[in-house]
Structures are given as C-alpha cells and as structure tokens.
Amino acid sequence: MCGMSYRQRFEDRHAQAITEAIEQLRGRASAAKTWTEYAAMYPPPKLASETDVLQYAASLERGAAVADTKMVAKLHDPALRTLFARIGGVEAMHWALLRSTLGEPPIPDSFLPAD
C-alpha cells in the first residue's frame, strides 16, 4: 500500500501543477476523473499474477511518458513545455523501473517511442 500512496502523490502533484498552469493562463482545467472512469478508459487486461500487474503498470507509464512528450511539441508557452517535459521524464523513469523489475532492459531503445 505504501507504494500506491507514494505513486499517487506523484500523480496528484502532476495534476495540481497542470491545473495551476492552465489557470495561470486564464484557462479552466477539466474536472478530475474518478478511478472508475480511468479504469473504463484504460481497462486492465486479466491480472492473474504480479507480472501481469507490473506489465500493465509499465504500459500505463509508457503511455503517459509518450503523451507528455507529445504535449511538449504542441505547446508554445515555455513554462508549460518545461512542465510537461519534467512530468514526462518522471513517467519515463517509472516505466524504466517497472521494466527493470520485470527483468527487461530498463531503457529498450535510444528514443522514447512516438506512439
């Protein structure tokens, strides 16, 4: 449980920083989704083992790292670009740690995937 609360703090801080950045630009952030809504958007496969859970978590972290990297390319505001680059770097580290835990090369390629 400690690992989940630790990870949740990261995600909460990321969401808070993004919300604050949007509000500083006089925008309005979308409402936070519940865990049930997220599960519906990213349904987990059958999680029958610890390996299944780690692989699913790794796929989510990879997806987050890729999404944040794509946001950097789309944004014009330097502060927002920096924010998404910093968050994406953390997500990539999470992905690498999960891959390493699975016995896979932590960094499988010279570049973060584009998809």
Predicted regions and their residues:
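All-alpha RGS (Regulator of G-protein Signaling) helical domain and cognate RGS-like helical scaffolds
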Residues: 1-115
